[in-house]
């Protein structure tokens, strides 16, 4: 599913910065940049009908911590806007094409008190 998301993001002029970024405090499936925006993306796949579930509160917190770690380690400019997105990919049946839904601003992380966060 992440490979499909990477291809779709590239067509939309996003530049992939990291894939499966892991650190002790969490993980982010994809990190991409488009202009002055840094986007942290959770990718969900579902092989049957219905929406792929959005990440729960604990998983969102781990993604936010991993985003902060990424920004710190990569010395990301504090002038970049951060955004947390969800990409849902589904393949309802063998005969149907896969479906991709990109949900920008899937959750708000403005409560994060970190010098890197910019709402």
Where are each of the predicted segments found?
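Active-site donor-binding loop signature of nucleotide-sugar glycosyltransferases
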Residues: 21, 43-45, 105
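Short strand-coil-strand connectors
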Residues: 22-24, 35, 94
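Short beta-strand or tight-loop elements
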Residues: 12-13, 24-28, 80-82
